[in-house]
A protein has these predicted regions:
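Cleavable N-terminal export/targeting peptides
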Residues: 1-25
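Short, hydrophobic/aromatic-rich segments at coil-to-beta transitions
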Residues: 25-32, 48-53
Length: 160
């Protein structure tokens, strides 16, 4: 009897999860991974054309959190494809391995402003979203410098 109840409960749980998946060409919330550097990403639309995105990057020299406010727009005749851009900010911490490339710098804190521009696509009929983006940033704390190498490719699972 316990096994039957456990199997029934598991089946109901998986059925509910399947129904919660988004299979349209739009979405409200998505969670996934970003490539270069490696990141966990979550994007949530607060309005049909406005989203908040959080990225937690992990790389050789430390960790960095970036928060972004994105404005999205449709691309005519391309269902599910949107352009986006917006401002943001980051907070990061790097370790002393940074000194291998920058001998005059010690481990420390990284605070700055970011921008983002890119394309976002939601597959109709599947709970999958991909995006490609460029995320230039300017660090203003510790050492002031511009970095144009953030961004890349993201693959997300859409929840709603």
């Amino acid at each position: 009897m316990k096994k039957i109840l456990t199997v029934t409960f598991a089946a109901m749980l998986f059925s509910a999860a399947a129904l919660a998946q988004n299979t349209s060409s739009s979405y409200q919330t998505a969670l996934g991974i970003g490539v270069y550097p490696g990141a966990i990403t979550i994007k949530h639309f607060t309005q049909p054309n406005r989203a908040l995105e959080g990225l937690l990057y992990f790389y050789n020299y430390g960790v960095r959190f970036t928060g972004l406010y994105e404005i999205h727009g449709d691309i005519n005749d391309a269902a599910g494809l949107k352009w986006f851009l917006g401002p943001g900010a980051h907070l990061g911490f790097w370790n002393n391995d940074w000194k291998d490339h920058y001998p005059d710098r010690n481990g420390g804190i990284d605070i700055g402003v970011d921008g983002i521009i890119g394309l976002d696509y939601k597959f109709k009929g599947a709970p999958i979203n991909i995006s490609v983006q460029w995320q230039p940033s300017f660090t203003i704390a510790s050492y002031a410098y511009f970095e144009g190498g953030w961004g890349g490719f993201a693959l997300r699972y859409t929840i709603k």
